[in-house]
Amino acid sequence: MKYKHIVFDIDGTLIDTEYAVLHSLQETIKGLSGREIPCSELRFALGITGTDALKKLEIKDTSYAIELWDKNMRNYTNNIKVFDGIVELLKNLLSLDYEMGIVTSKTREEFTHDFCPFGISHYFKTIICADDTQEHKPNAAPILKYVELSKTDHRKVLYIGDSKYDSKCAENAGID
């Protein structure tokens, strides 16, 4: 077995959050600046930290904007679900003795609030959130932190994500 560790991104990979993220961001921008930006123009925000997305949108007070975005996100929680087949996949990987982990752009608080309620976090031994590293995707730092904490060889790690930021992060870390 070439890989011992299978590491996942969360949003767009394990859980379907696209609608919730984009619409709550759209609502946040409108509330802060009055600008109405189509969701299609906000897709760049998928896969990077909320703070980085807000900076790209030239929002000055990102701390307040994150609070507002989190509040707005709660209006869309009914639109978030685990992708079909994920629970079965995780069970199968566990039965095959893979060690599973997470590398996400979510903060630890967002991870706890947005992901843990789905009841699948127990499948993952090592979890790296945005506040665990100073640099974020597409920088290699989050995956390298996973390699460090899991005490493994980077060649035994496979990273699965859905965005260009995920693939670039893995590439920058020398991970498949």
Question: Which stretches of residues belong to each language-model region?
Answer:
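Short, acidic loop-to-helix structural element flanking the phosphoryl-transfer center
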Residues: 75-102, 108-112, 140
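Glycine-rich phosphate-binding loop signature in dinucleotide/nucleotide-binding domains
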Residues: 1, 95-98, 150-156
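Conserved SAM-binding loop
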Residues: 14, 82, 100, 135, ...
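Helix-loop "lid/cap" segments that line or gate small-molecule binding pockets
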Residues: 28-29, 48-60, 114, 146-147
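Active-site neighborhood of HAD-like aspartate-dependent phosphohydrolases
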Residues: 1-44, 56
